[in-house]
Amino acid sequence: MLHPDARPSTLHLPPGDWPTVLDCLCQRFPAIDRQTWLERMARGRVLDAEGRPIDASRPYRAGLKVHYFREVPDETPVPFEERILHVDEHLVVADKPHFLAVMPAGEYVEQTLLARLCRRLGNPDLVPIHRIDRLTAGLVLFSADRESRGAYQALFRERAVSKRYEAICPALPGLPFPRVQRLCMVPGEPFFLMREGDGEPNSETRIEVLERRGELWRYALEPVTGRKHQLRLTMASLGAGICNDPFYPQLAERSARERDDYARPLKLLARRLQFRDPLSGAERLFESGLTLDW
């Protein structure tokens, strides 16, 4: 059995001539030394497809499925709690706080929404149906059942989900609203950024103004497409980058990006998700209980 309190990463061993699984892992992940892998194996943190521990003597076999539990020493706790809004046999809906990653990545393993929900609900089969950025707060949907998962994933793939965000950004008195903003989004530099390109638009966002307060306005953003950083780049391209965004329009210094300032969260909230349930046919509407302060 896989541990219910954590989600393993999975690797299908590539073709090669390594004598053992351990040798393959050491070459595949050069940043992790051999002793670390030995310690993980000794603690049952490296498993095969049946959930059986793999030890240092296990012979290598191309295509073998290996589950391993990523570990980050001294992982910094995120001092904000998620809120579970809905649970049924197929779906879990949660409000994610700012600064909490949805999935394990980089320096975040246990301090993720997925790991927290798996522990709280005792369900190791939870899988996010979509994702929002670590710095964004608001609604995230999880599949709680393997059999029905594909039906809900198809909703997002086919753009059958109405998504509404709120953002606080500088005022744009010179532009008419509501408006539809289309961009050609291409990979930028560094690799984790996106930028506006010269080709045909591949992203579309509907924008309206909800509230005006001096030099700052509250906007409703409805993405039709789902590009990486779409809302953040779209507002920056209009000259109204989302407040407290360390990436757009200007990339903050590395030292500032690597140190979360809990007093200055990104002013972006996944407010509402609406769709027709693929199983029951009922209209489903979920709204975040979080708010964006000015």
Which ranges hold each PLM region?
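RNA pseudouridine synthases
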Residues: M1-W294
